[in-house]
Each structure stands twice: as C-alpha cells, then as structure tokens.
From Swiss-Prot:
Belongs to the dCTP deaminase family. It comes from the Bacteria. It catalyses: dCTP + H2O + H(+) = dUTP + NH4(+). Keywords: Hydrolase, Nucleotide metabolism, Nucleotide-binding. GO terms for molecular function: dCTP deaminase activity; nucleotide binding. It comes from Dechloromonas aromatica (strain RCB). This is dCTP deaminase. GO terms for biological process: dUMP biosynthetic process; dUTP biosynthetic process; nucleobase-containing small molecule interconversion. SUPFAM superfamilies: dUTPase-like. HAMAP family: dCTP_deaminase. Pathway: Pyrimidine metabolism; dUMP biosynthesis; dUMP from dCTP (dUTP route): step 1/2. Its EC number is 3.5.4.13. Homotrimer.
Length: 188
C-alpha cells in the first residue's frame, strides 16, 4: 500500500467526487481570522466538523452499552461551537461526504491543535467503497470544559492505495454505516 499525494487527492475529488465539498488547497484563514486549517495537505485531507453535535450526558444514569445504546444519553446541539464537559465526549460529523474507491483504505488522525489541548479526535478507517458523512468522536480528557469549532479542521485523512483490489468491499458486504448522513450512533 502506498500513501497518496495531494495531486492524487485533487484528481480523485474532481473526477470521481471522492470528497464533497472539496477544498483543493489548505485553508488557514476565514473572514480575516485564523482558523484550525482544513483542505488538501501534502499527503492527506484535513476534514471539517459540521454544526451538528451530540454531547454525552449522564442525566439518565444509564450504562453505556454499544449493543444497546440509549440515544437519550446525548444532548443534541446545532452551533458553530460545542462545549464538551470535563472527562466527557461529543459526537459530530464531517461537512464533507466521502466516496472511497475500491482500491483505497483511509486512516484518520486527530489534528495536533486539538491534541495539545487534551481533546482527542477518534475516527475509524474508511473502508474500500464506503461512502457517507464521517461520524467524529471528540474526547475531552481534561478536568475543564473544552471547545471545538464547526466549519474548521479537526482531523486528517490519509489515503492508502493497495496494489491489489480487495475481494469484498464494505459496500459488497452491506456495511451498516454505508451512506450514513448526520451524526450516526452505534449499530449492531
């Protein structure tokens, strides 16, 4: 597997709609203000967080169970910023919609700007032929409230292309998160 360059990312976005909306350059400023960067970088694409958030709360005193997740464990927020309580987390989604080619697997890593503040961004790989909005998980590891920004960069996607096409893609096996839109909770 080889990592793909900015030229490849631009070509795949333009010719195959791999990322929509797409920024062909790295954007570091908006309306004269510095922002957490997003867009195409040398060997990746910095994704943005949308304005939809689900902030975890324990008001119902439930047990967190990935096989039987209680959606009432979240407070839904639509805003340009989201405050995550201390030692808690929030779910969000990307502004970008992805269509991953059959020969490609991605790895997504949180941006150091957030990591240096104790905010960890977790995203699983995007598998071959998966498509949808990416559900993001922001963990606030600090004892203080933490702020995240919609419309700004939050993580970087790295694209790896195999020298051999996979036998069965995510789409072929009917992956449960195929075509997801909005913030998607756990499914079994």
């Amino acid at each position: 597997m080889t990592i793909k360059s900015d030229k490849w990312i631009r070509r795949m976005a333009a010719e195959h709609g791999m990322i929509e909306p797409f920024s062909p350059e790295l954007v570091r400023e908006a309306n004269g203000q510095k922002i957490v960067s997003y867009g195409t970088s040398s060997y990746g694409y910095d994704i943005r967080c949308a304005r939809e958030f689900k902030v975890f709360t324990n008001i119902n005193s439930t047990v967190v169970d990935p096989k039987n997740f209680d959606p009432k464990s979240f407070v839904e927020i639509e805003s340009d910023v989201c405050i995550i309580p201390p030692n808690s987390f929030a779910l969000a989604r990307t502004m970008e919609y992805f269509r991953i080619p059959r020969s490609v697997l991605t790895v997504c890593l949180g941006k150091s700007t957030y990591a240096r503040c104790g905010i960890i961004v977790n995203v699983t790989p995007f598998e071959p032929e998966w498509e949808g909005h990416v559900t993001l998980e922001f963990s606030n590891t600090t004892p203080l409230p933490a702020k995240i920004y919609a419309g700004e960069g939050c993580a970087q996607v790295l694209f790896f292309e195999s020298d051999e096409i996979c036998e069965t893609s995510y789409k072929d096996r009917g992956g449960k998160y195929q075509g997801q839109e909005g913030v998607t909770l756990p499914k079994i």
